[in-house]
Amino acid sequence: MASVAWAVLKVLLLLPTQTWSPVGAGNPPDCDSPLASALPRSSFSSSSELSSSHGPGFSRLNRRDGAGGWTPLVSNKYQWLQIDLGERMEVTAVATQGGYGSSDWVTSYLLMFSDGGRNWKQYRREESIWGFPGNTNADSVVHYRLQPPFEARFLRFLPLAWNPRGRIGMRIEVYGCAYKSEVVYFDGQSALLYTLDKKPLKPIRDVISLKFKAMQSNGILLHREGQHGNHITLELIKGKLVFFLNSGNAKLPSTIAPVTLTLGSLLDDQHWHSVLIELLDTQVNFTVDKHTHHFQAKGDSSNLDLNFEISFGGILSPGRSRAFTRKSFHGCLENLYYNGVDVTELAKKHKPQILMMGNVSFSCPQPQTVPVTFLSSRSYLALPGNSGEDKVSVTFQFRTWNRAGHLLFGELQRGSGSFVLFLKDGKLKLSLFQAGQSPRNVTAGAGLNDGQWHSVSFSAKWSHMNVVVDDDTAVQPLVAVLIDSGDTYYFGGCLGNSSGSGCKSPLGGFQGCLRLITIGDKAVDPILVQQGALGSFRDLQIDSCGITDRCLPSYCEHGGECSQSWDTFSCDCLGTGYTGETCHSSLYEQSCEAHKHRGNPSGLYYIDADGSGPLGPFLVYCNMTADSAWTVVRHGGPDAVTLRGAPSGHPLSAVSFAYAAGAGQLRAAVNLAERCEQRLALRCGTARRPDSRDGTPLSWWVGRTNETHTSWGGSLPDAQKCTCGLEGNCIDSQYYCNCDAGQNEWTSDTIVLSQKEHLPVTQIVMTDTGQPHSEADYTLGPLLCRGDKSFWNSASFNTETSYLHFPAFHGELTADVCFFFKTTVSSGVFMENLGITDFIRIELRAPTEVTFSFDVGNGPCEVTVQSPTPFNDNQWHHVRAERNVKGASLQVDQLPQKMQPAPADGHVRLQLNSQLFIGGTATRQRGFLGCIRSLQLNGVALDLEERATVTPGVEPGCAGHCSTYGHLCRNGGRCREKRRGVTCDCAFSAYDGPFCSNEISAYFATGSSMTYHFQEHYTLSENSSSLVSSLHRDVTLTREMITLSFRTTRTPSLLLYVSSFYEEYLSVILANNGSLQIRYKLDRHQNPDAFTFDFKNMADGQLHQVKINREEAVVMVEVNQSAKKQVILSSGTEFNAVKSLILGKVLEAAGADPDTRRAATSGFTGCLSAVRFGCAAPLKAALRPSGPSRVTVRGHVAPMARCAAGAASGSPARELAPRLAGGAGRSGPVDEGEPLVNADRRDSAVIGGVIAVEIFILLCITAIAIRIYQQRKLRKENESKVSKKEEC
């Protein structure tokens, strides 16, 4: 809200400041005197009495006269004991006792109060609890202090439960003090105008307070108006109090929108409600009863042109005529104070500051209507009808929250029919049933379950029936027939099927309030019903409307929308980003680190940095790397800012940078991260800062806390140094930034801002000295934050008596606890926090059970999750427990969530006062042995490691994460432990990326090839074949796993060719018809085994996956993760002396069959990805080299992002990286066929000869050694023919 709005409010409330408080309106702070003990017996009354000696006059506390207390004639829930205090008093406490020397006492009761003995209101504890705790014997006294106190003349005690072996018996006392009350009554056509002191004083504090009792649901309570439409108004609208603040004429353009605040509900219940408006400096507090709304008014206190008048009860039209421009207030105001001035007293004394319009009086009339509350779906009220009349006519008013329910049923005379009036979907429906005719239905009204009073009039006579709901009339014509009124009408429900009445309520009974019931032309007096003189009833509360607004205050968090019925409320969390009964639990992970360990790849994600805290989720980019996860928050500022010379002292540029997240969200994300940084790239040409030597900063930046910073990069605060200045390598040593040198050439500074407490940058200001040709530009990068400090924050508990302690957990209305644990023990307490009687505890109760137990005053409650597998398996398990006003829930890992609803109208506040114990209990028993990690309470992370460093028996950190997160490493990747987390080692995988899940793909042009060498490259003569055979004897395979994916439209194609020094080979080809063919030749003296797999034409331009798994002679082939086929080899079981693997065109396929040679000559044109042969990943070795290369590339081979996402087969993708032509990872031309290693060429024949001789001698020696080794090994192989599987 802008300054004008604040000034309006300030001036409107302007009066000399006085020391004043609402208590000072008439009540001393010491208010606990006994009020009932001195009253005469006539001040006590009751529903009934067992005898004259058990009458209500004997119910004073600690008295023994009479029979020693009050006992009713019948002990049931419709009995009551009433006290008349003689005048309105402030009541602060009550006390109860049983009947003296008897077995008669009350164990729980309701307390109700009233001003005039009618229209009773129930006192509720903690805004929801109905009953008060009573006695457990006849003589002990139970006191209960009322918070908050209330003002009343009449009190009623209604027993709810009593000693089952006795009767109801009560002695009572009421404590409090006198209450000062100044009342003014407005009849809906009157008002009071108060003229303020016109002295131009500016008080520090402005206060207006009052109480009101409304007879109608709408009306103006107070109004103040200026000459240009400025005004404040306090208005009752549909039982809610609305505070309007308008700072200007609505007809004129204004940038200041009117402020509207709404508080309270059901305020038209004809009971007193308090209002307090406070203005302290710029802070405005608006309070209705116990509910306060705070808001900060912006601007100063400059005065506007306002009238020094304020009206109460209505808004007078110009000229002070008696005409009112809006609905005026009908009801009473009490103790009306304006900055400590008693306005009512001024009016009663006819002071000149007061002008009264209309019928204003100084006493408050008591309500005349008698409401009836239908407490349950079993409630009903049976009233006699006007038997024999030729019409049916009923009127009444009702209010409810329920969308459906039975309102009225009646039978017509002589069994001629019946009618039923009911609510369905918030609409009123009437159905008339007549013998021999189809039912007649009428619908009227809509949204009638809004808690407001609605008037209903129903009549049926001869040829028509009509229903009027408020102003909505519905008429239904009838066949002319005589309609005779029946004997009994059933309101709210039916007596029961056994009554023989024929009454049915298929939609359930009505829960709500009724009043002003008339049958025919006769008004019904519910007091006669209460006394048993009229009709009958069940589960009613007469002379009281017990409706409550369960959405005030709303327990729905994070913007969830509250809706309610009579018994409960519910929260609609759609679109909030939260879930749960009260929209408390976030749907999103807390950080990119948490997203990563869910197995999510890089991308856009919502994160909720404070979990279930008040800050909402926001969108970020998560960059998943092998070591960590980076959170990237981009700003909405310009990509680049260009600066040119300007007059000296004038800013060249002051650019602000806004972010999609709010300041609080950014602060939470930055605080959560291990490290944050933001890069500034600055380029400058002929720009300089000659005045920087005297310490005057010519450029600065503003962080999230709106503080100005002149330090750049990693420099110390206010050092005015760039990174080059710290490192001492600036281009001009007399300056601390390259761009300060003012060179006549373009220079640059790359600055990394890494002071986490100030990030992100919200503004950058650049100035210059006015050089006409100075020029510069800069680019601010996104905010980058690495990791999550809380995600791996952990502690190891080594003894059962060890624990960590923290301050008490404050989660009165909502408490959620989430953490990870791992253990090998069968039981132990994870956390415990105690109060005087309340407590909360989470424990591993058994190897397969986790239990969440607590007590908020309704008795201990437990929620248990049972698992089919043990939790003590030394793997991480995630626990999330939540307790709120709706109930409790517990979830462990992905097991079904267990829930326990809260009792209706029970205690809701969890009150804890001891220390919070983690890993143990206060008694040092049942302690937890194991690790606890990432512990959060209501979204706030606890630093376990910090506490563990100073706690005996507890160590910071936990080892062994791969047992839980190892599954994230896919496609052959291996999990490696880190101090804080895990990383995936993709060295032996055909994939890379943080989870070894990013496929490595390449486009092969026509005629290109890629060769992977399993052995060092040697050039040997044909005569040395036997020597080579011995040399490569160790590379013998009896099994191999092969995977590849491809996309092509060419046939025939060679997908993969593996050769051997023994002329053995394996080929995977696409035949001319596109079928997949596999050939194994494992014995050079036999023909190859050839297998054709007619799954489909696989040269269709689509991506296909092939997986081949050989175990000796058994080969299993799987295509596209679905089609499978098994074949048996006949040519052998050992693949000896494996030489190389070739993708694409094969120049020489010695000993290959004709089909393989044709495919080898054609090669492969298209995309290959994720190629793996055992531990060898040729594409990865070429495109992601990490050591000496074993790969030779010929022709055009270019990397692709993904085969499935690339261009069509036969053409390379546009986004490809630079192609690999004749080499991988090398610059300059490379001869075709050269291995991708840094081998020196030797052209000297002499040196070559010497080397050849040396190699020959060496090979001979090696062959002899190998032969001896083979002879020894042969004996073992003869004993066991089991082949050893190749391991990576």
UniProtKB/Swiss-Prot annotation:
User: Where are the bilayer-spanning segments?
Assistant: 1246-1266
Taxonomy, superkingdom: Eukaryota
- Give the family per the record: Belongs to the neurexin family.
Q: Which organism is it from?
A: Homo sapiens
Report the GO terms under cellular component.
membrane
EGF-like domain location is 547-584, 959-997
| Residue ranges of domain Fibrinogen C-terminal in the record | 585-792
Could you tell me where this protein is found in the cell? Membrane
- Keyword field: Cell adhesion, Disulfide bond, EGF-like domain, Glycoprotein, Membrane, Repeat, Signal, Transmembrane, Transmembrane helix
Which is a Pfam family this sequence falls into?
F5_F8_type_C
Q: Which GO terms describe its biological process?
A: cell adhesion
Something else the entry says is: The gene encoding CNTNAP3B is the result of a pericentromeric duplication of the genomic region encoding CNTNAP3 on chromosome 9.
> Which residues are connected by disulfide bridges in this protein?
C31-C177, C332-C364, C513-C545, C551-C562, C556-C571, C573-C583, C931-C958, C962-C975, C969-C984, C986-C996, C1167-C1203
Specify the signal sequence span: 1-25
Q: Which residues does the record list as glycosylated?
A: N359, N706
Where would I find the Laminin G-like domain in this sequence? 183-364, 370-545, 793-958, 1016-1203
Region Disordered: start and end of each range? 23-61, 1215-1236
Topology versus the membrane: Single-pass type I membrane protein
Its gene name is CNTNAP3B
Main localisation: membrane
Q: Which residues lie on this side of the membrane: Extracellular?
A: 26-1245
Q: Which residues lie on this side of the membrane: Cytoplasmic?
A: 1267-1288
Q: What is this protein called?
A: Contactin-associated protein-like 3B
Biased composition, Low complexity: where in the chain? 33-59
Q: SUPFAM superfamilies, per this entry?
A: Concanavalin A-like lectins/glucanases (SSF49899), EGF/Laminin (SSF57196), Fibrinogen C-terminal domain-like (SSF56496), Galactose-binding domain-like (SSF49785)
Locate the F5/8 type C domain: which residues? Answer: 31-177
